[in-house]
C-alpha cells in the first residue's frame, strides 16, 4: 500500500 506507516516499508513510502 501507499500509506504511512503501515505501507512502509511494505510496498509504500513514508509520506
Curated annotation (Swiss-Prot):
Root EC class: ligase
GO molecular function: ATP binding; glutamine synthetase activity
Location of this chain's protein in the cell: Plastid, Chloroplast
Annotated catalysed reactions: L-glutamate + NH4(+) + ATP = L-glutamine + ADP + phosphate + H(+)
Example of a GO cellular component annotation carried by this entry: chloroplast
Entry keywords, A to Z: ATP-binding, Chloroplast, Ligase, Nucleotide-binding, Plastid
Domain of life: Eukaryota
EC number of the protein: 6.3.1.2
Transmembrane feature ranges: none
Other facts: On the 2D-gel the determined pI of this protein is: 5.7, its MW is: 42 kDa.
Family per record: Belongs to the glutamine synthetase family.
Subunit organization: Homooctamer.
Record's function text: The light-modulated chloroplast enzyme, encoded by a nuclear gene and expressed primarily in leaves, is responsible for the reassimilation of the ammonia generated by photorespiration.
Name listed for the protein in its UniProt record: Probable glutamine synthetase leaf isozyme
Species the sequence originates in: Pinus pinaster (Maritime pine)
